[in-house]
Amino acid sequence: MEKLVVLVVDDEEGIRSGISRILNNFRVGFPFLEDDFEYDIHEVGTGEDALDFIKNNKTDIMLLDNKLPGIYGIDVLEYLNKNKFDIQVMMITSYSSLELAVKATQNGAFNFVPKPFTPQELKSAMESITKHLFLKRMTNKMTQDDKELRHQFL
């Protein structure tokens, strides 16, 4: 079973712990794979702590609130985009606006889930982002394998 590292960034501890509880035993699988994906979940309460975490830990998926003390979530997202971190980001915020959704999408957010959300909505969004991440990595590996194969024949 492959574990994906998930960072939950929200200033509300209740939201963070609720997300962790929902995803703790949740698995995502493909019919053609033997093993499912599961999550290794970490929580932080500020944008600064999120940046510290990703600089020191491999992170696959980030669930990111926008309204954070200090650095806002959209600023964290811009940092990830500017510095080319390979992290799939799902924005989770109760302060949603069309402008924020557009800016988040332009900066690479995969999904935008407004709070409050149900456990099923969160699981569905996580299934989607996990499958997207798997397919993206598979495509990148195939592209790399193709380049190596071409190089061998040159």
Where do the PLM segments sit?
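CheY-like receiver
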Residues: 133-154
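Acidic, metal-coordinating helix/loop segments flanking the phosphotransfer/catalytic sites
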Residues: 35-61
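Short amphipathic alpha-helix used as the core "switch/output" element in two-component signaling
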Residues: 25-28, 52, 74-85
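C-terminal output helix
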Residues: 99, 117-126
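Two-component/phosphorelay signaling modules centered on CheY-like receiver
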Residues: 13-42
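Active-site residues of response regulator receiver
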Residues: 10, 65, 93
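Acidic catalytic/metal-coordinating carboxylates
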Residues: 46, 72-75, 96
